[in-house]
Amino acid sequence: MNLNTASGGTVTVSEVAFGKDFNEPLVHQVVTAFLAGARQGSKAQKNRSDVSGGGRKPWRQKGTGRARAGTIRSPIWRGGGKTFAAVPRDHSQKVNRKMYRGALQCIMSELVRQERLVVVDEFTVDSPKTKAVAAKLKGMELTSVLIVTDNVDENLFMASRNLPKVDVRDSQGVDPVSLIAFEKVLITVPALKKLEEALA
């Protein structure tokens, strides 16, 4: 299949990578797993055995008129432990390579169908100035955009990192979440070829 470039030319790409039917359950599962894997998972609380103190019975069992108590660190006491204390855990979910590649194929194909994929010959700036990238994107009428290049140029990275709703990745750094998070995906021809090679 052929894709039109912003300069008026065309580039031939694989039907497998850019002409796949959209599989919503697959994309949902892969995106959910990706976000789950990004969770820190380090939350920790103390249960009644973790809280310091409370080794002695606060008062005798009978004869005081008060409710019986065995420890001052009971979860119903102020300063006591948490009933179901959170422990550090791994939130990651298993996604095999075939599923991950299939989800990326679905997303790229949907971007093509919705005309959200903008192909350019190259995208570079001469200096790390934000206004240089801002002017280029304004000229192309792009506000929310993921820029995918063959190799991330330091000038381009520095110039774009202060712009809201703009991110720069190389072809190996794209992921399902970044591809769907922006209104448009601006990709250079060399990056497109590398991505096609990885997805085909």
Curated annotation (Swiss-Prot):
Gene3D superfamilies, per database record: 3.40.1370.10
Question: Organism's domain of life?
Answer: Bacteria
Region (Disordered) residue ranges read: 42-69
- Keyword hit for Ribonucleoprotein: yes
One Pfam match: Ribosomal_L4
Ribosomal protein in keyword set = yes
GO BP terms, alphabetized: translation
Q: Cite the InterPro entries for this sequence.
A: Ribosomal_uL4, Ribosomal_uL4-like, Ribosomal_uL4_dom_sf
- GO cellular component: a single term: ribonucleoprotein complex
Keyword annotations from UniProtKB, A to Z: Ribonucleoprotein, Ribosomal protein, RNA-binding, rRNA-binding
Single annotated GO MF: structural constituent of ribosome
As for what it does, the entry says: One of the primary rRNA binding proteins, this protein initially binds near the 5'-end of the 23S rRNA. It is important during the early stages of 50S assembly. It makes multiple contacts with different domains of the 23S rRNA in the assembled 50S subunit and ribosome.
Q: How does it assemble?
A: Part of the 50S ribosomal subunit.
Q: Which family, according to the similarity comment?
A: Belongs to the universal ribosomal protein uL4 family.
Q: What is this protein called?
A: Large ribosomal subunit protein uL4
